[in-house]
């Protein structure tokens, strides 16, 4: 997965799988928006809840402030949500 954080000009930070990018557009899938919780952590919610599942979305670059790599723990959580395969945690067993 090519997991990225996209900052929209509306202020939202959207975690996505980036499929393709051109000078004018980005093609993404599985967009989630990060939302702070009362416990100080970040939760995820759907960014485009009315879009058909597993369908890509095209976004104009004119709405994008920046694109960046997501933090490792964010990528791991994102992949757990969208991966059809359950992956074990990377902790050592003693």
Task: Pin down the residues of each PLM region.
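Conserved RNA-binding domains used in RNP assembly and mRNA/RNA metabolism
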Residues: 1-94
């Amino acid at each position: 997965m090519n997991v990225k954080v996209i900052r929209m000009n509306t202020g939202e930070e959207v975690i996505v799988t980036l499929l393709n990018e051109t000078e004018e557009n980005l093609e993404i899938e599985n967009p989630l928006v990060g939302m702070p919780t009362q416990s100080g952590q970040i939760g995820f919610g759907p960014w485009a809840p009315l879009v058909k599942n597993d369908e890509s979305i095209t976004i104009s670059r004119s709405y994008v402030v920046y694109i960046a790599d997501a933090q490792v723990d964010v990528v791991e959580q994102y992949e757990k949500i969208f991966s059809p395969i359950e992956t074990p945690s990377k902790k050592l067993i003693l």
